[in-house]
Amino acid sequence: MTNEGIGINRDTSTICLREYVFIHFFPVKLISALTNKTNTMVKLTSIAAGVAAIAAGVAAAPATTTLSPSDERVNLVELGVYVSDIRAHLAQYYLFQAAHPTETYPVEIAEAVFNYGDFTTMLTGIPAEQVTRVITGVPWYSTRLRPAISSALSKDGIYTAIPK
């Protein structure tokens, strides 16, 4: 889990898969196919299998997706960053809450902050406009949250307009 709270970093496992396929599978099959003089079909099949394995490794890389800012997947990434930021700067959030006592937050966010397990399911169903309101309502949104959200979305291969 990354410190932004967005989940598993798929980039690392993808690189390992590609390296494994390229280093272990492809050269052995290619050399075997090229040195086997008895069956031309084996040569073509083995080469095709090696190429398919490399293509599968490349296809396993995270695809990029353009989503609406109100898409629930975008909201979950934003809320994951927000929960992680609250955990990292709890005193600052307490001071902000004390200065703005009428500012309300969904109860699911408070539960996620203090539950250090998988909080993703707790945060589903919060309306997009409420997510935007609570995240952009803090003074450090543009300096701390927006860059972290942008980075987290990018790591997940998600591109969208982020509220300014």
Curated annotation (Swiss-Prot):
Pfam families: SRP1_TIP1
InterPro entries for this protein: SRP1_TIP1 (IPR000992), Yeast_SRP1/TIP1_CWP (IPR050788)
Gene Ontology MF: a single term: structural constituent of cell wall
One Gene Ontology cellular component: cytosol
GO biological process per UniProt: fungal-type cell wall organization
Lineage top rank: taxon: Eukaryota
PANTHER family noted in UniProt: CELL WALL PROTEIN CWP1-RELATED (PTHR31002:SF34), SERIPAUPERIN (PTHR31002)
Family under the similarity heading: Belongs to the SRP1/TIP1 family. Seripauperin subfamily.
Protein name: Seripauperin-21
Organism: Saccharomyces cerevisiae (strain ATCC 204508 / S288c) (Baker's yeast)
Taxonomic lineage from the root: Eukaryota, Fungi, Dikarya, Ascomycota, Saccharomycotina
